Amino acid sequence: YICLARPGASNQTIMRTLLDNIANLDKDDIVILNWTWINRWDFYNLQEEKWSTVRPASNEATEFDKLYYKYFQSELWDKLETLKSMYLANSILNSYGIKFVQTSIDDLVFNTEDHPPDYILALQNSLNNDILYFGNKGFYAWAKDNNFPMSKGVGHPLEKAHKEAYEHANKKFTQS
């Protein structure tokens, strides 16, 4: 069991972490991707030469964060980009023959109440069978409802919840 999760990471960070580690995986490994809130995004900061994450709940909101959420952020774009990352991960892991499951903290990813465009529905439908739920809950709601330790501030589920999520996901492969 190896946990590569990082509090506050975006879905783009999750995707880059998978790509950075895909060559080190073998067919006996099980990958669990716990996708985060759809409104967290990365950009490459040329001045600092590193990736930076914008997120609405940040206590350290920069001017860039404020401008981004005021003028550019939209639920439709967030949902599309998140679903694209999930689909890319699905495709890559399948092409490598790696067993995997995906969970999502954010219910908005698969929400269809706002009559999403057909391209959103197509991605949602292609991924729906690969999403692991904990009962009828996503990872975050399950961890919170089961009183797992959470980080201070934004309340990210800590290592114990990630380990239990792995055990839950592992049952999918050992019982099939």
Describe the role of every protein-language-model region.
Residues 1-13:
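A short beta-strand-loop structural module common to alpha/beta enzyme folds
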Residues 16-176:
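Alpha-helical cap/lid subdomain in secreted, periplasmic
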